[in-house]
Curated annotation (Swiss-Prot):
Disulfide bonds join 27-54, 34-48, 38-55. Belongs to the beta-defensin family. Residues 1-22 form the signal peptide. It is found in: Secreted. It comes from Pan troglodytes. Pfam families: Defensin_beta_2. GO terms for biological process: defense response to bacterium; innate immune response. Coiled coil: none annotated. This is Beta-defensin 124. The lineage of its organism: Eukaryota, Metazoa, Chordata, Craniata, Vertebrata. Has antibacterial activity. GO terms for cellular component: extracellular region. Its main location: secreted.
């Protein structure tokens, strides 16, 4: 009986699977990821609500706004 109880407890403990993307919060319209550090292929855009960095791939980074030169 104790082996059956131990087996059921082990199944309950090992059967709990956390959600896969719970750590990776999204930002920048779902294209960026909130992280502590950005990878080499990413750039920092702004801060996420939890004060982590919003990392966006260089391929998805919007082009810079051109500056008007006054002559």
């Amino acid at each position: 009986m104790t082996q059956l109880l131990l087996f059921l407890v082990a199944l309950l403990v090992l059967g709990h699977v956390p959600s896969g993307r719970s750590e990776f919060k999204r930002c920048w319209k779902g294209q960026g990821a909130c992280r502590t550090y950005c990878t080499r292929q990413e750039t920092y855009m702004h801060l996420c609500p939890d004060a982590s960095l919003c990392c966006l791939s260089y391929a998805l980074k919007p082009p810079p706004v051109p500056k008007h030169e006054y002559e």
